[in-house]
């Protein structure tokens, strides 16, 4: 009711796939909504997260309209509580209307779906290239700082992990990071489960979960998305990667193929380092998986990023 939803509550369902926030699907006589409690251990200043989301959605919708596209149904619309689109009450809460006829899945199998996923991300980057990144808050300092996140492992016992692998990746990244170009507004967490699938067309229709939006490199978004959608049995599926790349570049964004390649390698190695760091130190960024599962995910990342 704090968000102005007056009609009767019917039931709720906890959605458990997210690593960070607590998410619930709320059914009421007024409609279906998605309610989230933001993890303030990860997002120390959640108000700034919502400021970034407001700025991003406003910018993209304006760009879409200028290009003759309809933004309706393409993004979550957050509901206000008073003057804000969030509520502070025993935590930090927000709610938005459930986008009808949509689902999320953890993996895409069909190359047509993967190609459309690439096009959706390419369109996102095309529209965010012109955004003024000085307007964005840094909500997670050091997030996707590849060199910093990998090099922090170097202080641990070299026998505790694959030191040589990370040293090779680190040196290669430092030598080639100029390829990445300039920073722009990016999503920073593009993966299959953050894409809505329209159940009528069976095609990706919207990107969600904008909490990590900050200035960054579009190549890292490309790499994150390709890692999530184009791997089978811990190996890159070239057919899927070609489909994803075809869709991405068809959207007209300006990223180079070399930058995309470096983004895929770097972001996957960084993810491996984060799983390993959590496992070694007992940190709890990935709150829904235990130490053993983190190690398994670390090894999975190693399998498809190990240099030849």
Describe every region a protein language model picked out.
Residues 14-17:
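Protein kinase glycine-rich loop
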